[in-house]
Amino acid sequence: MEHKKEKVGTGRFTHLILKNSRIFVGINFDQDKDFQSALCDPDYETFLLYPGDDALEIENGFAERRPSRPLQIIVIDGTWPCAKKMMKLTTTLHETPRLSFTPGKTSEFKIKHQPMEGCLSTVESIYQVIRGLNAAGIEKTGAKEENLMEVFRKTVEQQIECAKEPGDGYRKKPFSLPEERKTSKKWSKRLLFFRGL
């Protein structure tokens, strides 16, 4: 699920790399017949990659669950505020079982400011899920998921180089690395925004 503002986000090239993936663009998918058909496909066991108290953690007991059908994982591609809105408006997702993981590292998306520690880009999240499914013995990709991170890292490097170039860019301030940035005070007021439904 890609927010319409994220057409150049990491979800787009992740979709181009991953086989058997589909992309749906919008905000509210309740009336999207193709999306609803995929969501309710009886041939798959469907999970939504989204945090929550009732989310199953890949690292904690998911292997024992052993899905009887092939897995289908829905991923929301957008900023955290956009993801929240998409989740709220698409009511058919509210009863979809959730899947989550424990971030094992800081995001490598240096060009973009992450709101909180542990927040990852779409491609990094999908990479973590694939690795977790491999570790659980549910998937056997032969480390092909490393291609995702290779493309991602090269993209980030290129974006950083472009950001450093002087000229009429969209940035109001010079580019700085994540460790040099100050966290906005606004984020502390938005914690419920991320942790709620």
Where are these regions (language model features)?
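Short, charged, surface-exposed secondary-structure boundary motifs
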Residues: 8, 32-35, 59, 107-112
